[in-house]
Amino acid sequence: MTIIRKKHPLIKIINHSFIDLPTPSNISSWWNFGSLLGLCLIIQILTGLFLAMHYTSDTTTAFSSVAHICRDVNYGWLIRYMHANGASMFFICLFLHVGRGVYYGSYNMIETWNMGIMLLFTVMATAFMGYVLPWGQMSFWGATVITNLLSAIPYIGSTLVEWIWGGFSVDKATLTRFFAFHFILPFIITALVLVHLLFLHETGSNNPTGLNSDADKIPFHPYYTIKDFLGILILLMASMILTLFFPDILGDPDNFTPANPLNTPPHIKPEWYFLFAYAILRSIPNKLGGVLALILSILILAFMPLLHTSKQRALTFRPITQIMYWTLVADLLILTWIGGQPVEYPFITIGQTASIAYFAIILIFMPITGMIENNILDLD
């Protein structure tokens, strides 16, 4: 068996990636989220595949086809709710994975980090298009509002929006193409994940100290396969509790009403995992400025390696920057809350303050605290 594992051209790749992979001996549970994201992706592809067998991407039948899946298809309700809540679990793992990367300075592995940012954008696009497919009120109006933001692009904006819509409004053509893209993108994501892993295995994993761990590596299997398995069990248990006991808790009640272009919901808002970015978008009165801030709220991650001023990699031994980091986390939670609130006083002011704080912490305060810590520890 050992000979096959190490010699066979295909099994050899799996062996080097998941079995004999030299891994730092001290990586904590924060390093579990990579494998959990892989599991989420597999669950989403499988449940999505079965949903696609029964779903129809036509404006007249899309809503009723989802109802048909829940009522008439064997375990259709389970597949549908696993897919919908699976997206939420996916984003929880994604945010924790990115947060871990920021905390422990993993962004210094630039190729892996940039690949991760590309993955984040692709997953967000996929989730957005998936939200449109049930063709409820929030699906329709969410699609209308978000796609309409592209009209802010100078000169080509209006033409671009009509091109994406396939007409003069969100309609049958839009739904059909969104379904096509939503179906194909997870497979593109899978390919990007392989490239992400390829880059990661070029440098090896980071670890909680942020120090070079070449002197202390252990094989991935059995030590981290068993650790990942525990994480997988916890994730599956959490997913099942969410799916079986609270299936609609993260959804919007407006989506139980079929899409009606003549009736606008009182508060148009996206799924919870986009609310922080939506709050940043809304906090800027200018349309183009809002769109740029929306894109920058994620793209700012790409500037992290350039903004790293500390002589240490991780925040493990940097208490001042730790305060900044946890303030940033609190700020993101505030933005998420504000994104779900109506556009009125005091929410507008809170949203604008939190948006300024978000960019200020990343662009100004964290680099400054890094330099202060260098001076305190005399690392210059």
UniProtKB/Swiss-Prot annotation:
Keyword vocabulary terms for this entry: Electron transport, Heme, Iron, Membrane, Metal-binding, Mitochondrion, Mitochondrion inner membrane, Respiratory chain, Transmembrane, Transmembrane helix, Transport, Ubiquinone
Keyword flag Cell wall biogenesis/degradation: no
UniProt binding sites for heme b b562: H83, H182
Binding positions for a ubiquinone per the UniProt entry: H201
Cofactor binding: number and manner: Binds 2 heme b groups non-covalently.
Transmembrane segments annotated in the record for this chain: 33-53, 77-98, 113-133, 178-198, 226-246, 288-308, 320-340, 347-367
Entry's Gene Ontology cellular component terms: mitochondrial inner membrane; respiratory chain complex III
Subcellular location: Mitochondrion inner membrane
Extra facts: Heme 1 (or BL or b562) is low-potential and absorbs at about 562 nm, and heme 2 (or BH or b566) is high-potential and absorbs at about 566 nm.
Stated name of the protein: Cytochrome b
Species of provenance: Microtus oregoni
